[in-house]
Amino acid sequence: MVMKGGKYDRLSDLNCFWAANDPKKPDNLFARSEWRNGVFKNYNTLDLFYVGYGGNDNSTTRFRRYNGKYDGGADDKVKPLLREYTDTPHLLVPNQWYQISIRVQKGVTTYSVNGEELFRYSITGSEGDGHFGLRLLQNHVLFTDFKVRIF
């Protein structure tokens, strides 16, 4: 997170999702993109894993499992919180590079930062298959050496 006094230099929300699918359009995640239109609650209709690293103005780092069954109900039913950190070592630091690794392999998905595994979740079948995406909110982020590898 770049913090040098720029317009979007805001220390918050290095968020990503993976294994994303739309249960209503299982063959095309993008079919309802216009309807979702960046509205956060409309993403509750997707099936995915989500990490909000340094979310809520850099006060939380959370791991959620969106189940794609949004019916207007409570968030904890649609996207249950699997784990949360609120301690300083698991929040964003200004102008620091991060090595983030997300794995979906051998019945498990993991999310690690700088070699520390923060989140682990057991999966079955094709549960880890799907799309990857970044969700950044009014911040300034630089990426280098971005890779997607299939094992």
Q: What are the residue ranges of the model-derived segments?
A:
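Extracellular glycan-recognition regions
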Residues: 1-151
